[in-house]
């Protein structure tokens, strides 16, 4: 699949997903204890590809998203939102103290360019918080449906970070995707055959239920043992130039 095809799949899927739902408050996510602890030293903030589930506080944060409904709704809530892509961020070098990108990087074919851009806009010593799915062996129809270009092998991810002067401070297992094969297969059937109805159920039933049953993130210094993890969230610091 070409990079252009992946972008088109992402835009079509997420425009439809976000066009008829609401902005969730960042404070409701299990990432909030982490994010809120970073805010005092992060006056300049950017979140990329938040959808309507931002993890950084909306007011005063810059947001970049490919989805038009997302940009409009975040602006209405006080965010500094603009359309754009993670491979060409419309900001100068060394702009931000904190950058977030949750479930975004895996959607981009040219991930080296992604990390080059993330490292470019971060100040020296700035923090990158991002989440990606792990292990090609866990690839499912869902990955293809939502526009994933890959799932990461831990060694490849470590090499990418090192190449772009990003050092892992801590990490944890992450994600809300169901791991029950039958449930996933049933969900995929609805997504492919009854997409509009499936998205309504996701936005108004399954996502709210998932929020109620979120588990506390268990961070470990450096890279948490990735064996068996389907997804990971990492806190990285930008080394001085």
Model-assigned labels for residue ranges:
Residues 31, 120-123:
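Short, cationic motifs built from Arg/Lys/His that form the positively charged side of catalytic pockets
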Residues 102-105, 131:
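Residues lining the SAM
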Residues 1-94, 98-102, 112-115, 172-174, ...:
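Conserved N-terminal segment of class I S-adenosyl-L-methionine
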